[in-house]
């Protein structure tokens, strides 16, 4: 009997890690925090890939490249456009709470629907501007039930009060 061929491109996600990822579809925001090289991106991509096999969903993948807020905002606009949501191209980067609130209102209105929508922000630790994490908290508190934010970071970034308010 011939030996089975191994596929070195197979990703193995342990049952324990799979269990840790399952609540993502029930939470407004999930943070995945671990040191570099621990597979944060791989695990989230696996999770999203598995869900995409069984249901129609929208996936918006945003990569953080530096602590420059303008570059991050351009990444956000491009990521939403690639996912078919071009409405953000009109928006300037919000600079205060009022602008952030207006953006949250419009995001919630445009993303609400029947299909699940996952917004995956990778390497968030590179974005050191505290306004970004506060904006994510404001967004998570108002998201429609079909939208889920997943944030991968090397460091904890949520203020303690916001973590409690979000249920973490």
Question: Where do the protein language model's features map onto the residues?
Answer:
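P-loop NTPase Walker A phosphate-binding motif
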Residues: 30-61, 78
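Short regulatory helix/loop adjacent to the ATP-binding pocket of P-loop NTPases
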Residues: 155-168
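Conserved P-loop NTPase "ATPase switch" module shared by AAA+ and STAND
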Residues: 107-132
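Conserved adenine-nucleotide phosphate-binding loops and their immediately adjacent elements
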Residues: 1-22, 90
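Conserved NTP-binding/hydrolysis module of P-loop NTPases
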Residues: 70-90, 104-108
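Short acidic, S/G/P-rich loop/turn micro-motifs used as interaction or catalytic elements
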Residues: 39, 66-67, 124-128, 157
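Substrate-engagement module of ASCE P-loop NTPases
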Residues: 138-147
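Structural recognition of the conserved hydrophobic beta-strand(s) that form the central parallel beta-sheet
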Residues: 118-122, 147-154
């Amino acid at each position: 009997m011939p030996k089975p061929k191994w596929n070195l491109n197979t990703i193995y996600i342990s049952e324990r890690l799979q269990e840790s990822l399952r609540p993502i579809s029930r939470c407004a925001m999930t943070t995945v925090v671990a040191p570099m090289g621990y597979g944060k991106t791989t695990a989230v991509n696996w999770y999203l890939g598995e869900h995409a096999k069984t249901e129609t969903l929208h996936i918006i993948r945003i990569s953080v490249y530096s602590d420059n807020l303008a570059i991050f905002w351009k990444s956000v606009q491009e990521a939403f456009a690639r996912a078919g949501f071009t409405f953000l191209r009109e928006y300037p980067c919000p600079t205060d709470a009022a602008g952030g609130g207006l953006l949250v209102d419009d995001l919630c209105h445009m993303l609400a629907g029947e299909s699940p929508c996952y917004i995956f922000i990778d390497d968030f630790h590179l974005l050191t501007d505290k306004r970004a994490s506060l904006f994510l908290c404001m967004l998570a508190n108002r998201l429609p039930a079909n939208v889920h934010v997943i944030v991968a970071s090397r460091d904890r970034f949520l203020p303690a009060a916001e973590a409690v308010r979000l249920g973490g």
